[in-house]
UniProtKB/Swiss-Prot annotation:
It catalyses: RNA(n) + a ribonucleoside 5'-triphosphate = RNA(n+1) + diphosphate. Promotes RNA polymerase assembly. Latches the N- and C-terminal regions of the beta' subunit thereby facilitating its interaction with the beta and alpha subunits. The gene is rpoZ. Keywords: DNA-directed RNA polymerase, Nucleotidyltransferase, Transcription, Transferase. The RNAP catalytic core consists of 2 alpha, 1 beta, 1 beta' and 1 omega subunit. When a sigma factor is associated with the core the holoenzyme is formed, which can initiate transcription. One of its GO terms (cellular component) is DNA-directed RNA polymerase complex. It comes from Neorickettsia sennetsu (strain ATCC VR-367 / Miyayama) (Ehrlichia sennetsu). This is DNA-directed RNA polymerase subunit omega. Transmembrane segments: none annotated. InterPro entries: DNA-dir_RNA_pol_omega (IPR003716), Pol_omega/Rpo6/RPB6 (IPR006110), RPB6/omega-like_sf (IPR036161). Its EC number is 2.7.7.6. It is an enzyme of class 2 (transferase). GO terms for molecular function: DNA binding; DNA-directed RNA polymerase activity.
């Protein structure tokens, strides 16, 4: 498995997608009652605390990533995004889709397809 380190000498070493997925899952966990693993200001919101925890490298990132995938499967057939909660067919389809996405992400992540050095926002190009 890949080493889930996000910052090496101040540079992001994972994809932005992975960082957003992990931070959003950890923020969700904090909002659901999990206790923070790092010192933080009283005024810090859960997304800020989540990013501080990810930066501290004290998390089990694989477990956090798979918790995010499970949450997507859980909510995919429960009335969100226009899907009827009465539809029994929605959940197996969503579960298969997420398993396919999860498999593809693992393959891409392990093959180093995700590379932040090749990605830039239009706003960033004018700053250089």
């Amino acid at each position: 498995m890949r080493d889930w380190r996000f910052f090496e000498d101040g540079n992001l070493s994972c994809s932005r997608f992975e960082l957003v997925i992990l931070a959003s899952q950890r923020a969700y966990d904090l909002q659901s009652g999990s206790l923070p693993d790092v010192q933080h200001e009283e005024s810090d919101k859960s997304p800020v605390i989540a990013l501080k925890e990810l930066y501290s490298l004290s998390m089990d990132y694989e477990k956090l990533f798979h918790a995010a995938i499970r949450r997507i499967v859980h909510f995919s057939g429960s009335g969100y995004a226009g899907i009827s909660s009465d539809s029994g067919a929605a959940r197996p389809h969503a579960r298969g889709l997420v398993e396919h996405i999860d498999h593809d992400l693992v393959e891409e992540r392990d093959s180093e397809v995700f590379s932040d050095s090749e990605f830039s926002f239009a706003e960033d190009e004018g700053d250089e």
